[in-house]
A protein has these predicted regions:
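HEAT-repeat alpha-solenoid elements in large eukaryotic scaffold proteins
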Residues: 126-130
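Alpha-helical oligomerization segments
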Residues: 124, 135-199
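Helix-loop junctions and short alpha-helical segments
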Residues: 13-102
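Conserved aromatic-histidine-acidic binding/catalytic patches
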Residues: 3-6, 43, 47, 93, ...
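N-terminal leader/presequence regions that precede the main folded/catalytic core
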Residues: 1-15
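A mid-sequence, solvent-exposed acidic-amphipathic segment
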Residues: 92-125
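Alpha-helical structural elements of signaling/regulatory helical domains
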Residues: 47-54, 114, 139, 161, ...
């Protein structure tokens, strides 16, 4: 009953704190004095993996479903039909320009306390990845590519001018933009022989 006195934000922040600081005891030293045992060494990675596995059993059942990611953020679980897309691990030879930006955008968009501004930043970051790929002539064919960059350039995501379309439901359309950009990036990388591993 007591857990109901705490907000979701408080509990999730506590989970993130515990994940950052948890370690698994590895080597014990026992003494005769009061029959006590003390750990002499710890493994942080193993501790985090076990903690994440255990806590995710409960987080998945809470509200719409959440998960604790490897980076230590409590994230909203993507819709079932898009979960594989979100969990696809991208590995390219342009880690800073592509891999890290995709990971940062995904974490920012799906984080339990993300705001509309956070979601806009996440969409814009994926747009930066598309722009980077475009500079290397990695683009969708024909009208599809034009449509992607029409969204980026004319829907108040990264430019500020009179032709921007800004009167739309941000919550709904940012979700559409995010998953459209993410799926387009993964498709382009697969088509161009970059390594994309499905977990």
């Amino acid at each position: 009953e007591w857990i109901g006195t705490y907000s979701k934000e408080y509990i999730f922040t506590l989970i993130e704190f515990l994940y950052d600081n948890v370690s698994k005891p590895m080597l014990y030293e026992c003494t005769d004095y009061r029959c006590t045992c003390h750990s002499r060494s710890f493994n942080k990675l193993e501790g985090q993996n076990e903690f994440r596995k255990d806590i995710n059993v409960f987080l998945r059942k809470f509200e719409a479903g959440y998960r604790l990611g490897e980076e230590g953020y409590v994230l909203l679980i993507a819709p079932l039909e898009l979960e594989v897309l979100v969990n696809t691990e991208v590995s390219t030879d342009k880690e800073k320009e592509v891999d890290e930006r995709i990971k940062d955008a995904t974490n920012k968009y799906l984080k339990f306390d993300s705001t509309i501004s956070d979601k806009k930043d996440a969409v814009r970051t994926l747009g930066d990845v598309l722009e980077y790929l475009k500079q290397h002539n990695i683009i969708l064919e024909g009208q599809d590519n034009k449509d992607l960059f029409n969204i980026l350039n004319n829907f108040d995501l990264r430019h500020h001018n009179k032709i921007q379309h800004s009167e739309y439901d941000k919550e709904i359309w940012y979700e559409y933009f995010f998953y459209t950009f993410l799926s387009s990036i993964n498709f382009l990388l697969k088509q161009n022989d970059h390594i994309v591993d499905d977990k």
